[in-house]
């Protein structure tokens, strides 16, 4: 699970959506958290605990959303030619 603290909303937006967003790290985290949830037969995957300007928020998804999130990660890996991660994601999709 990703744990991050941001001093401002701008810093938060830049991390997730900015030009230099760490998208591979974000998708790796999503895949890993869903993998854990599937392995432990959990209904929820917890992606992140974030603090933005002192306000805490949790980011998670429920089992019906696992496939969509994994497909988004798979598309990201394909578009960015990170093929070595595709098989693991497809294996997780097949488990659902």
Model-predicted segments: where are they?
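Long, acidic/serine-threonine-rich intrinsically disordered regions with weak helical/coil propensity
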Residues: 1-15
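Short, charge-rich, low-complexity alpha-helical interaction segments
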Residues: 13-62
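Alpha-helical structural elements
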Residues: 7, 11, 22, 41-42, ...
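Short, compact, well-ordered microdomains
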Residues: 63-96
């Amino acid at each position: 699970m990703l744990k991050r603290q941001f001093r401002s909303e701008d810093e938060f937006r830049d991390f997730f959506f900015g030009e230099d967003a760490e998208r591979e790290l974000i998708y790796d985290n999503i895949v890993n958290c869903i993998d854990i949830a599937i392995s432990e037969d959990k209904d929820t995957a917890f992606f992140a605990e974030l603090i933005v300007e002192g306000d805490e928020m949790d980011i998670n998804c429920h089992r019906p959303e696992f496939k969509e999130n994994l497909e988004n990660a798979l598309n990201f890996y394909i578009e960015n030619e990170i093929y070595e991660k595709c098989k693991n994601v497809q294996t997780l999709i097949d488990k659902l």
